């Protein structure tokens, strides 16, 4: 995303800017769908679908790069604001229903709001420190990749720990998966035609984050399919 202040896109990039903007809007819609579906599943199953630690990181990222810093791209500004609003709603439902998943750990169960407050505050401070160190443009994109890595790993661990599909769905998985990797279109054009600001895309750390996230997403989809298959089998067995 374009948080590189004081710079303008070169003419060779401008020819493809409309393609990047279109991909950005698709990405924005799919992640908005993810947040909406997560809120719906929270209400329906009285639980939460996004793991607590990654959710705090993701929410802090949206807070920092919507309220404190702002994208130079008008579409990204609209999308980030929309995400922050929807994520706030989702977090509210998460705080409300999270105690249902922590009956085995009363200390956690009684302190869910404080855990979220402390988690978000810590991630906000860390992200502001990183932005002050390397600049908001680089920090924003690095942390976006980190957030997604944490979300994928956290979601898979949570799914396997629960052994149940409560709080999640194929819609949540696919909107997260496709909504992230449609961003490859943006990355391709910005890296090739705006290298002054986006050469970091080719750094080993970004390749590492992207590769691990992709592998985990595929494993998540297979695991969700297997668990849903087991749940359908149990329903059939109970109906006999």
UniProtKB/Swiss-Prot annotation:
Name the keywords, alphabetized: Glycoprotein, Lyase, Membrane, Transmembrane, Transmembrane helix
Q: Name one Pfam family in it.
A: Pyr4-TMTC
Which reactions are catalysed by this chain? Answer: verruculide C epoxide = 3-hydroxypentacecilide A
Positions of glycan attachment = 197
Superkingdom as given in the UniProt entry: Eukaryota
> Which Gene Ontology cellular component annotation is one that this UniProt entry carries?
membrane
- Main localization is membrane
Q: How is it used?
A: Compounds in the chrodrimanin family such as chrodrimanin A or verruculide A exhibit strong inhibitory activities against protein tyrosine phosphatase 1B (PTP1B) and therefore, they could potentially be developed into drugs for the treatment of type 2 diabetes or obesity. Furthermore, chrodrimanin B, the end product of the pathway involving chrodrimanin A or verruculide A, does not exhibit the PTP1B inhibitory activity, while it functions as a potent blocker of insect GABA-gated chloride channels.
Membrane topology field: Multi-pass membrane protein
N-terminal signal peptide? none
GO molecular function term, any single one: lyase activity
Class in the EC hierarchy, top level: lyase
A biological process term (GO) from this entry: terpenoid biosynthetic process
User: What pathway or pathways are given for this protein in its record?
Assistant: Secondary metabolite biosynthesis; terpenoid biosynthesis
**Protein localization:** Membrane
Return the EC number: 4.2.3.-
The record's InterPro entries line, in alphabetical order, gives: PaxB-like
- The transmembrane segments are 16-36, 48-68, 78-98, 112-132, 134-154, 167-187, 205-225
Family membership noted in the UniProt record:
Belongs to the paxB family.
What this protein is reported to do is described as: Terpene cyclase; part of the gene cluster that mediates the biosynthesis of chrodrimanin B, a meroterpenoid that acts as a potent blocker of insect GABA-gated chloride channels. The first step of the pathway is the biosynthesis of 6-hydroxymellein by the polyketide synthase cdmE. The prenyltransferase cdmH acts as a 6-hydroxymellein 5-farnesyltransferase and produces the hydrophobic metabolite verruculide C. The FAD-dependent monooxygenase cdmI further converts verruculide C into verruculide B.
| Protein name as annotated | Terpene cyclase cdmG
Source taxonomy:
Eukaryota, Fungi, Dikarya, Ascomycota, Pezizomycotina
């Amino acid at each position: 995303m374009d948080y590189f202040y004081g710079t303008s896109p070169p003419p060779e990039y401008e020819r493809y800017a409309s393609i990047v903007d279109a991909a950005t809007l698709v990405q924005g819609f799919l992640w908005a769908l993810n947040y909406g579906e997560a809120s719906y599943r929270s209400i329906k199953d009285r639980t939460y679908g996004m793991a607590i630690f990654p959710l705090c990181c993701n929410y802090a990222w949206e807070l920092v790069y919507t309220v404190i810093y702002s994208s130079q791209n008008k579409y990204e500004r609209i999308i980030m604001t929309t995400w922050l609003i929807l994520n706030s709603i989702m977090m509210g439902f998460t705080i409300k229903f999270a105690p249902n998943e922590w009956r085995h750990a009363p200390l956690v169960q009684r302190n869910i709001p404080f855990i979220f407050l402390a988690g978000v505050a810590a991630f906000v401070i860390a992200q502001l420190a990183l932005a002050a160190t390397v600049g908001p443009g680089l920090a924003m994109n690095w942390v976006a990749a980190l957030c997604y890595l944490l979300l994928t790993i956290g979601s898979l661990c949570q799914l396997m720990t629960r052994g149940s599909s409560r709080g999640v769905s194929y819609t949540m998985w696919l909107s997260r998966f496709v909504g992230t990797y449609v961003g490859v279109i943006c990355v391709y054009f910005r890296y090739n035609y705006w290298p002054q600001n986006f050469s970091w895309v080719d750094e080993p750390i970004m390749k590492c984050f992207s590769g691990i996230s992709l592998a985990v997403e595929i494993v998540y989809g297979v695991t969700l399919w297997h668990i849903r298959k087991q749940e359908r089998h149990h329903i059939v067995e109970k109906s006999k």
